[in-house]
């Protein structure tokens, strides 16, 4: 990994006021963490920083930071931008030693076309970055995962991947990295038969809500009691 040189100056004032004045001068505040010392607060040119991190590594870019004549190796770790202007407002660096391994997140990139995709499956990436331990100048740009032989319904775990030369995976080995999912089938609702106007309900079925009651002249069922207040015709015959 090639190193880019970045110049900065140490700052003694912290807070919103001093940071605002720095930005008015065309500089931004930054902090260097790590090592056995307290964090170092510096000021630097944002345009120079953006140019220095125009590398495939991005957040793991190794830089030589020169602060008031003293040099230290750092990794670019984080930044803050203005939500409206998108201008760089702040940056964070991690100080490293060139002979001591560090742990960093390295992005996962799939290579090839999965066999399961040709069968109608859907390739999904479950783990987008893997923690890798390596010397600062051996940090890989990406972890390439060959998915060519991956069939539908199958997956690849961290334990099945080969770490780049000079690196160790510091990640749970049983984690799924990529898989080919079985496509979901759309369920088609069964058609509902439309009711025929005037059709009698099935035997034992209750009439639909709002349906008319039986006609007044309809005979009651065998053995049924007469309606309340109605006359029993059989009783009239008995009186005669």
UniProtKB/Swiss-Prot annotation:
CDD domains: Ribosomal_L25_TL5_CTC
Pfam families per UniProt: Ribosomal_L25p, Ribosomal_TL5_C
Positions with biased composition (Basic and acidic residues): 230-240
Gene Ontology MF annotations: 5S rRNA binding; structural constituent of ribosome
Keywords, ordered alphabetically: Ribonucleoprotein, Ribosomal protein, RNA-binding, rRNA-binding
Keyword Flavoprotein: no
Region annotation Disordered: where it falls in the sequence: 1-21, 204-240
GO cellular component entries: cytosolic large ribosomal subunit
InterPro entries to which the protein is assigned, alphabetical: Rbsml_bL25/Gln-tRNA_synth_N, Ribosomal_bL25/Gln-tRNA_synth, Ribosomal_bL25_b-dom, Ribosomal_bL25_C, Ribosomal_bL25_long, Ribosomal_L25_dom, Ribosomal_uL5_bac-type
Record field: compositional bias (Low complexity): 204-229
GO biological process, one term: translation
Ribosomal protein as UniProt keyword: yes
Family: Belongs to the bacterial ribosomal protein bL25 family. CTC subfamily.
NCBIfam families xrefs: bL25_bact_ctc, PRK05618.1-2, PRK05618.3-3
Subunit structure of this chain's protein: Part of the 50S ribosomal subunit; part of the 5S rRNA/L5/L18/L25 subcomplex. Contacts the 5S rRNA. Binds to the 5S rRNA independently of L5 and L18.
Summary of the function given for this chain in its UniProt record: This is one of the proteins that binds to the 5S RNA in the ribosome where it forms part of the central protuberance.
Record-given protein name: Large ribosomal subunit protein bL25
Source organism of this protein record: Anaeromyxobacter dehalogenans (strain 2CP-1 / ATCC BAA-258)
